[in-house]
Amino acid sequence: MIGRGLLAVALGLLALAPIKARAAEKFTTIYSARVMAQALPWIAEDAGLFKKYNLDHSLVFIASSSIVTAALLGGDPDMTMTGGVGNVIAFVRGSTDIAYVGSAKNLMTQNIIAGGNLKRPEDLKGKRIAVSRIGSNSHYFTIQALRRHNMEPNRDYTFLQSGGDPESLTALLAGGVEVACLTPPTDVQALSRGYHYVIYGPDLKIPYAATSFVTKRSTIARRPQAMAQYMRAMGEASKIMHSDREVVYKVLGKQLRIDDRSILDAAYNAEIKVMEPRLALKAEAFQAILDEVAQTDDRAKKVKPQELTDPRFLNDMEKSGFWDQIWGKR
């Protein structure tokens, strides 16, 4: 009887053992852009946060938000970090398993950059503008920004799909295009080469779920604990991003091969102003995308922003005191 009693106690203690004592759970994130706004997984890896939260994490880069959405629906990743209208279009068309669980950025910070005598938006008529992909953040921003100057795609300008921000910069520097839509820190690299802003995006304050954490409701149901641990890792990475620029510079320097501190300073100072410290989901950011999709698909008019999101992990991080613990009450 004593032996059985000791065994029962031992099993009970094992059940109460901290999560770190258990085997790490495999977890895959796909991200779509090599930019500061999508640097949280890089920061988490550098800081050992995935290990802290008992995740055996794999990070995969695919330079297309539409392909990332297809991969998500195909069942490959546990989480995606992406922007663009792809996820919303898929939801509107019936893929309602998609769920946004957090956002790193809810405003657009792209910029339209050119050289020579191209100074005003009107000067871009007839030009080809480099964007990463059709349907990407840079594509959407260019349309929205130039629409404010009564300019429309195909009628007044066309696009070159480069594949990503670094590739758009390469096309600009090589003379393949005269205009490019770029995001920090790539825009600052162009400025250092003598190019200039035609439109400075942050001034426009265009609401948009530009960088979000997107998964599937079925994955949440199957792996709620792993999802909760992942979001806490991202929460801590966000704290590092906002409070320790030296770590951010180290990570960006490694990932983007940038060692010019003036470029990193300019990029960080511009981007950090619009990053969400607590990964907030904002209705207006999703409504902006729904409004755009509704121009070609009436079904988007019936979708409410709240239907796209699942804030359970953010709510738990708030109620449990997680945010207050890492930020300090303020």
PLM features: what roles do these ranges have?
Residues 23-174, 178-184, 196-207:
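Short, glycine-/small- and polar/acidic-enriched structural segments
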Residues 5-17:
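Bacterial N-terminal signal peptides
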